[in-house]
Every structure is written in structure tokens, then in C-alpha cells.
């Protein structure tokens, strides 16, 4: 990939996270990159395609990690704990990401359809989710967890993790004390969500 293309992606990600998709123009991206707008359209054709080129790798991480723990010799519940831990770690790297994802899905519901078709249903990208789906069904059949669809479990986990990072900015400022309190809050939320999901999987 040429350096100018990488720079466009980097600047676009920064502006999308700061201003949202609708609040960011390709003209603004071009100005920040130091290139003309035609060059952005040459590489990415549309702002929508640029958006997905920026954020698809992050969405892929969300789904692909479903497969990572499944190769290890852990029981299912322990793997669920590791998935939640990974999602919190991923979102902690840039806490603007979770509010951005939630806002974009609310403003542009069609993006959820794109996410589902590309990352959960397409033949190539759905392998990790397919393995996760199979494991959930096996655990249900063994009687170790209650009846639940894999997609419902994944969405429950995603919603709970995302909401923690959406709410966190509301109660804390930027001082050192607030940063520490925020970190402690997120650690508590991770523990609470893990307990909630794990307990919710148990058969009644």
C-alpha cells in the first residue's frame, strides 16, 4: 500500500472518530492529508467505502477473536471470559471507538445489515463465527448451558461491552484522579459483565 493511501486511512479514522461519519467530508480529509479530493476518490471511490476500509479491520477483530480461544484447551465458560476480556482490551486502546460504533449503528441502521452479511454470513469471514456457533450448539446439547442462539450471545456480549465505554465518559473528567476512577470503573464493569453473561448461560 502506498504511503499516501495509508495516510488517508489514518486521517480518515481520526476524523471519523472525532466528528462521526456525517460530520466528516472527503474535502476535510483531503485537506488534513495534504492532497486533493480527487486522490481520495481515486483510492476509495466513495466516503462510504473509505469508512468500511478504515473500520472493517476492527470489526473483523471482533468476530475473528471468537475463534482464537476456541483452539485452546479451555472450557466454554472460560473462553467466554477471554472473549469479554479481549473486547474490553480492544476498546480500551481507543475509547472513542465504542461510542462511535454505537452512534453509527443508530444513525445508519443499514450498517448493521452490512456487518451481519460481511462478518457473520459471508463464506470467508464467517468461519470464526461458524465455529463459535457450532460450539454454542454443542454446549446446549450437552446441557452445560441453557438454550441460546450464538448470534444472540455475541450481540449480548457486544452490547454490554460497548455500553460500558459509552457511559464511562459521562461520569469522569480528565484529571489523574478521574482517569484512575474511570479505569477502576471499567474493570468493575468487565467483572460485572462477565458474571452477568456467565450466570445468564446457566440452565435454570
Predicted features along the sequence, with ranges:
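Short hydrophobic clusters on alpha-helical segments that form packing/core surfaces
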Residues: 8-16, 87, 197
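Helix-turn-helix
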Residues: 7, 15-49, 53-54
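Amphipathic alpha-helical linker/stalk segments
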Residues: 54-83, 116, 135
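Short secondary-structure transition hinges
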Residues: 88-131, 152, 179-186
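Generic hydrophobic, amphipathic alpha-helix propensity
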Residues: 4-12, 29, 54-58, 62, ...
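C-terminal peripheral helix-coil segments that are non-catalytic and often amphipathic
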Residues: 86-89, 93, 126, 130-142, ...
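Short, leucine-enriched amphipathic alpha-helices that occur as contiguous helical runs
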Residues: 1, 5-13, 47, 190
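Hydrophobic alpha-helical connector segments
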Residues: 68-99, 150-157
